[in-house]
Structure formats: structure tokens, C-alpha cells
Amino acid sequence: MGKIIGIDLGTTNSCVAILEGNTPKVIENSEGARTTPSIIAYMEDGEILVGAPAKRQAVTNPRNTLYAVKRLIGRKFEEKEVQKDIGLMPYSIVKADNGDAWVSVRDQKLAPPQVSAEVLRKMKKTAEDYLGEPVTEAVITVPAYFNDSQRQATKDAGRIAGLDVKRIINEPTAAALAFGMDKNEKGDRKIAVYDLGGGTFDISIIEIADVDGEKQFEVLSTNGDTFLGGEDFDQRIIDYIISEFKKDQGVDLSKDVLALQRLKEAAEKAKIELSSSQQTEINLPYITADASGPKHLNLKMTRAKLESLVEELITRTIEPCRIAIKDAGVKVSDIDDVILVGGMTRMPKVQEQVKEFFGKEARKDVNPDEAVAVGAAIQGSVLSGDRTDVLLLDVTPLSLGIETLGGVMTKMITKNTTIPTKHAQVFSTADDNQPAVTIKVFQGEREMASGNKLLGEFNLEGIPPAARGTPQIEVSFDIDANGILHVGAKDKATGKENRITIKANSGLSEDEIQRMVKDAEANAEEDKKARELADARNQADALIHSTKKALTEYGDKLEAGEKEKIEAAIKELEDAARGGDKAEIDAKVNALSEVSQKLGEKVYADMQAKAGEGATAGAAAGAGAAGGQQAQPQDDNVVDAEFKEVNDKK
């Protein structure tokens, strides 16, 4: 059985880890970095770039370079958060036939799980290159506050990438695993994991206990905001730069897609620099042009200015912390450790606010970029049976229920219930002789169902005629360890039953997932062909170069006809190398190798002759030296050299 890898599929960056023995290992990607930008670019020739190569070309290809796609995963197009992003993203967000938010690149509509699958494929390949064996199973992390549709969509992305997703695990819980397994502190500890990433915010209160030699991680409560993160901080900086430039130059950069992409890069860079310095300079020459000529952007920005721009965003993270503490039934003073996760927690102002709320400094010994992937890898080793000393008890982040008479949300499973869990309740009909009931499943905290998220609906038909309130219909809710919901309804009189795994009334159908899996496999085949073609071209170039060089040096030793044949074969190979037919290139490589055989023989003979001359000259010199030595009187008193052994091993 192969290893189950741990993947942190982030909004801005992603990371992959494994467990070697009991030691977690974050794996470096093909560019040598431990994290990979979650950026995907679709090129004109059909090539798909992922990570740093995609990020590098974003400025020149903004409409076809996708980033922060995780913010769209499992979401409807009409949701206000999606509508807000439409005006901000340089790429096109469109409405799918099922009402979901999809993206459009190069006249092609793509589902967010399909795009995220490209990042997961890169993570999978990174692990395979390191392990030297195929990887088919993974634990993937999601924000704790992700709802059912978002979890389901993440699982779909894994399938499209060719991974069997063994478990979906919450990011703060994964970070707690990484922290807890790394520490040898005994006794029970309550920790707060404050996770502010690129696109989402989570806070979880977790109890770590030692139970009979095994570490038990119990999530007491979780809260958050799935549309608050580093991308929003970047946007505040971008808006500020645009307004300052408009004041200064009278030009609105928000209408210029290329300029926006450059501003995005500059904003991210400024934000990072201001975490370690008090001031930075945003310098973008030739940012745009008007009738008077090119315009340059030069703007100084202080840390204080940045903090004033994003203060409201940081404050928004504190209310979920309050709710999480209350839901966990603990006091702020009961928290032993505060752990910061996500790149945004490097910002001094964020650390300051967290310290102010919890009354203590956050731990500095947890890597905010890598802890989540490490925790996922630990959970992978638990699932594969390699580790038996860890027990993880997670919770469902939001209440689940059904719509009952009057549009009321009747909660079946309340938020922060430990999962997996089951709950059943008996309901009845609202009308006389009602032949069927529609079960509408919602997720959320509002009293009325319409204020919550509809996850799905199904019918239970064939109910025998009876007065209203007489039939006994048992509705059962069952949440698995991934936090994914299965709902059933049963007429107790007839035994008739209907069950569904909640696939949001949007989401991808099985057929769509299968098609995307096939597309991904075809892409992998295309990638392989492209690599083989590149190798063939490299081989052709090397042969052309060496043959031309030999022809320059030794061509005059060949007959005119032979030389012409070689030159013609070189020309044919050059033409073939410019095309895209690997078989044609291989054939022309063989043809050139064959006709230049005579030339090769001439080169070889010449080298042998030179080597022979060198050897003869060397032998003569050697003989001279030997003769000189014989003229010296022989000294028979050979003295043994003294030596002593030095032992370097300390």
C-alpha cells in the first residue's frame, strides 16, 4: 500500500507533506520551493501552467491566469460574495447551467473543482517524484467553516486529479495535529488555532488530551468567515493605489486589466515587505499611457497606512473568536496556547490584535505555511494504520436541519457536534391524504429556512392516504468523518425509504466528474507527449550542432557528394524539428546519423592520430627522463617516512 499524502489546498499557496517514520516531511516542488502558488494559466497552445511558472506570466496573460479559485468552489453564481469578486478579478466568472459560479478561459467554461484539480495534480506529481512511486490516496484540508457543498466540491477536485480522497480534514484541526504531535507536554491543554489564509478565516478551540498513551484531539468549537483573507487585504492596497494614482494623474487604472495584474503583484509584495519594515515604495514604470505619453507610478507606503486600510478586516476576525470561545464553553483565560496559521498571520497588526483578545503571545514555533499540510500527512498515516497513537474528534461547523411547516428551520444536528454522528426524528404530513413529502435540507444558523443554505432536496412518495399528522415519517441525518451529509426518510407504516448523499442542488454530476477525470487523464497524456517532443527536439538540436561543427573542421576531407548529402540531411532535420511530429524528428535524426557516419569516422581517425602523436612524444620524453635518472648515482639508503594517523571523529 502506497503512502497517503497530506495536501493543504490553499487559496493563495498549496503545500504537500508525507510522514517518514514518525517525522513529517514537507516536499519541495520541481522549482525547489516548499509551497506552490495556487495559480493556473491556460496558454494559447493548450498548455496548462501551474504554480510559479503561471505566476511569472500572469502580467502578460491576465484573462487566462486563474488565482484564488478556492473562493468560488462550491458556490452559486448569485451569492453576494461571488458577485463582489466578479468586479475584482481580471478573469471571467460566469454562471454555469446549474447556477454555480464557474470561470471562463479561452472560450471554455471550467468548474472550480476542475481548476483546483490542476493544483492537486501538481502536488501529487511533487510527492511521486520524491517517493519514486505512484501516489493515489490523499488527505486534503479545507477551511473549518466550509459548508457541505464546498467540501463535496473539494472531494470532486481530488477525484478529477486522480486521487482517492481518504479524508477531508479541517485546516485548524490539521494545524493542531502538527502542533500537538511535535510537543511532549503532558496533561490536557486547550489551544486556539487562529487561521487567516489567502481567502478564508477560521478559529477553532481544540482540547489536546493524553488518554492511555494516545493523544486525543477534540475540537470543542469552530467559527469563521469563508470570504475573508489575504486577497481582501491585497484588494484594499490596490484600491488605495488606484485612488492615489487617479488623484495624481487623472487616470483610472481599474479599467486596465494589464495594469490591474501588475498592481496585484505590487500590492502583495508591499504587504509582505511591510510586515518586516516600516515603509516601502511601490514603483511601477509605464503602468499606463494616455495622449500625453507614458505614465509611471511611484508611491511610498507606510506600515501605519496599511494598518489603517485593513483595520476593519482584522477586526472582523475577532467576533468569530468570541463566538468560538462561548460555544466551546470556556473562558479566554482557559486557553493555554494560541497558534497562528496562514501567511496573513505574519502581519504585526494581526499578531497584536490576537494578543489583545487572548491576553497572551501566540506561539512562534509553528510554521504558518506548512503546519496544515503536516497535520494532513499525520492524519494520512493514522488512516493507513501507520500510527495508532492519535485520535481526532472533529465537529460540524454549521447546524443542519430541514424545512418544516411555515418555512421554519428545524435543526437536526446543531453546530459543533462531534462527527461522525447520526440523528433521527419523526415528522408527519401537513395535509389530509398527502401522498408524498418533500424533504428540503438546509445548513446554517438562521431560524427561518430561507435564510440558510439549501443543500439539497428529495421526495418520499407512496404515503398511504391518511389524515394530516397521522403518517409517521422518520427523517435521519448521518454526517461522515469528512463532514459530508447523508439524509434518509422512511415511512414507518409501509417501510418505504429514500436516501441521498447531499449533493447540493448545484455541484457536479457524476457524469461531469467522469468527463473531467478523462480530460485530466488526456491532459496528462498530452503533457507526456509534449515532454517527449521536447526531448526529441533537444536531441535533434544537439546532433545538428555537433554535425555542423565536425563539418566545419573536417568537411574538406570528404568527397563533395558526401558533404552535400550531410548538408541536405541537416536541413531536413532542422525543418522536422520546427514541426510537431516526434516520429518525423526521430526518422530525420536517424537519417542524419547514417549519412554522417563517414564524417564520424574521419573525426575518430583524426582524434586517434592526435592521441598517437601525443603518446609517442610522451614516450620519448619519458625515455629522456629515465635516462637522466640513470646518470644519477643510486642511493640505497632508503629512509621510511614517518607518519601518524589522525582521527577526525570527535
Curated annotation (Swiss-Prot):
Q: Which GO terms describe its molecular function?
A: ATP binding; ATP-dependent protein folding chaperone; unfolded protein binding
Q: Summarize the record's induction comment.
A: By stress conditions e.g. heat shock.
Disulfide connectivity for this sequence is none
Q: Which Pfam families match?
A: HSP70 (PF00012)
Q: Which InterPro entries match?
A: ATPase_NBD, Chaperone_DnaK, Heat_shock_70_CS, HSP70_C_sf, HSP70_peptide-bd_sf, Hsp_70_fam
Which residue intervals make up region (Disordered)? 612-650
Tree of life domain: Bacteria
Per the record, where are the segments of Low complexity compositional bias? 612-632
What keywords appear on the UniProt entry? ATP-binding, Chaperone, Nucleotide-binding, Phosphoprotein, Stress response
The residue ranges flagged as biased composition, category Basic and acidic residues, are 641-650
- Which parts of the sequence carry Phosphothreonine? T200
Q: Which PROSITE patterns match?
A: HSP70_1, HSP70_2, HSP70_3
Q: Which family does it belong to?
A: Belongs to the heat shock protein 70 family.
Q: What does this chain do?
A: Acts as a chaperone.
Name assigned to this protein? Chaperone protein DnaK
